[in-house]
Amino acid sequence: FWAFNTIAGRAAVDEVSPLLVVSVRWFFVSILLTFLCRKELFETWKVLKYRLKWLVIMGLFGFTSFNSFYYIAAHDTIAINLGLVQGTMPAFIIIISRIWLKEKINIPQLIGVIITFVAVLLVVSSGNLYALMKLQLNKGDIVMIFACTLYAVYAVGLKKKPNIGPLVLLTFFSYVAFIGSLPGLFYESFTSNLVLPGIKGIIILSIIIIFPSFLAQIFF
């Protein structure tokens, strides 16, 4: 399901502006989840209102910010690079777990981190050591690395989640994500960078809403 995000993110270039994608994405996901979890929302809020800071940080880092930088990066790099950089996310999660939670990195994890980065470098350079030495990251790649770091913080933060079902928790995250996306959408509008979707853009948005936004998050 995550793969749809990479493909749709690139397809959205020139069809719908990146920050509009984020706002529309979480607006419709929040409506869908509210309907599905309507019976649990009130009781869940009784728990989450005491974890409001955690809820806001998680929603902003893992959803609003990650998605915003992801779709911005898609304008400056190719889908393969997006997928490759995103493939390093488990390594970022291990590193941030060490920094934030002081978790020890065991030998298999360390080997996994090394293999992940080496594999990405080999693919990017086509196995050519000389090409690797001359490798230059473009703007989109750098933005994508930053986006993955933000999502890694979110993934590690999930270890501190209260005893709440994943679907209803995702519902509250989607509220934060949508509200948090509005300043970016306003900025995009006021700077004349807003691109409204046509038929193709609507199809792309629908794919993003259903697969990486809803199904992928639930299974994650």
Description of each model-found segment:
Residues 1-6, 34, 40-86, 122, ...:
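Specific transmembrane alpha-helical segments of multi-pass solute transporters/efflux pumps
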Residues 1-24, 133-160, 179-184, 203-205:
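Glycine-/small-residue-enriched transmembrane alpha-helix faces in small-molecule transporters
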Residues 4-16, 21, 28, 67-77, ...:
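Juxtamembrane C-cap of transmembrane helices in multi-pass membrane transport proteins
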Residues 5, 28-32, 85-99, 114-115, ...:
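Alpha-helical transmembrane segments of compact multi-pass small-molecule transporters, enriched
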Residues 15-65, 92-93, 149-154, 170-189, ...:
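Transmembrane alpha-helices of multi-pass small-molecule transport proteins
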Residues 20-31, 70-110, 147:
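Specific alpha-helical transmembrane segments that line the substrate/conduction pathway
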Residues 33, 56, 105-127, 148, ...:
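Hydrophobic transmembrane alpha-helices of multi-pass small-molecule transport proteins
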Residues 46-50, 83-86, 99-122, 134-141, ...:
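Loop-to-transmembrane alpha-helix entry segments
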